[in-house]
Design a protein with these regions (language model features):
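N-terminal FAD cofactor-binding segment of flavoenzymes
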Residues: 35-89
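Predominantly flavin-linked oxidoreductase catalytic cores and closely associated redox partners
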Residues: 123-258
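Low-complexity, highly charged intrinsically disordered N-terminal segments
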Residues: 95-99, 195-197
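N-terminal Rossmann-like FAD-binding beta1-loop-alpha1 element of flavoenzymes
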Residues: 2-30
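Cofactor-binding loop segments of dinucleotide-utilizing enzymes, especially the Rossmann-like FAD-
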Residues: 11, 34, 252
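Conserved Rossmann-like nucleotide-cofactor binding loop
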Residues: 14, 37, 175
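Short beta-strand to alpha-helix junction loop
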Residues: 102-122, 258
């Protein structure tokens, strides 16, 4: 039976960061991704931040993927404007929150996660293979069992032979199947969840620049609150990408059930 130091379940940004960091530390780690290709299930997009708090320690993306991350990764636009719009019928009150967002911050870039996660995966897989691990796509975990005497965990899947690890990282999202299989936590209730809906609108780069009064190397983030949510608890967002807009809304799940 194959043995590894760590099994990571889920090929999103969290799982890939874990694989990259563990491999850099010399651990033999394997990442199992249910999708046929890393990134195909990641349709989200937002703003990726790098922070520098005055107190405490934050491990940023460039700490894991290298200080040249900004120049190498498929980022969209550096966000240089942050605006909050409060709506009420035919009135809008706008506030500039740029200074607050830039406080103790290195940068914020708009991103499309299907593109960025593919880049994360290539970098993480290269590091993992050097340590005897790697990424295995198209694999669904169906059982996880713990042997206290051997201090080993056995991973069983639908597609490949079972194998053993010393530790498991559940990085398979908010509806984690690993958490359900292992009873690590109960299912979330509607009061604990938000539902997001996003559309990507294709526009010429120069139209985006002119419409939002930004340059080619800058971007804008617009947040919306008020009656735009039609009496539901939530808010809206609009982020400028290179030649698209990410537009959507996020609602408190239980407010959608009323």
């Amino acid at each position: 039976m194959e043995k590894y130091d760590v099994a990571i379940i889920g090929g999103g940004s969290a799982g890939l960061a874990a694989l990259k960091q563990l491999s850099t530390l010399g651990k033999q780690a394997v990442l199992l991704e249910a999708g046929e290709k890393v990134g195909v299930k990641n349709i989200s997009g937002g703003i990726l931040y790098s922070k520098k708090p005055n107190n405490g320690r934050v491990y940023n993306v460039e700490d894991i993927y290298g200080q040249n991350f900004v120049n190498e990764a498929p980022l969209q636009r550096k966000i240089t404007q942050y605006l909050l719009h409060a709506t009420s019928k035919d009135k809008v009150f706008s506030m500039d929150l740029t200074a607050a967002h830039e406080y103790q911050s290195n940068f914020g870039y708009s991103v499309l996660m299907n593109e960025l996660n593919a880049w994360f995966a290539q970098s993480a897989d290269e590091s993992a293979q050097k340590s005897g691990g790697g990424i295995v796509p198209g694999v669904h975990v169906n059982d996880i069992s713990w042997d206290a005497e051997k201090e080993r965990t056995t991973i069983q899947t639908d597609e490949i032979d079972e194998f053993q690890v010393k530790a498991v990282i559940a990085a398979d999202g908010v509806n984690s199947e690993v958490a359900q299989i292992t009873n690590a936590r109960p299912k979330f209730s509607a009061t604990q969840l938000y539902q997001g809906v996003k559309a990507v609108v294709k526009l010429p780069e120069n139209v985006i620049n002119d419409t939002f009064a930004i340059g080619t190397d800058s971007g804008a983030a617009h947040l919306f609150a008020g009656d735009i949510t039609l009496n539901h608890l939530g808010g809206g967002f609009l982020y400028t990408n290179r030649d698209t807009l990410s537009v959507g809304a996020v609602y408190h799940f239980d407010s959608l059930l009323d």
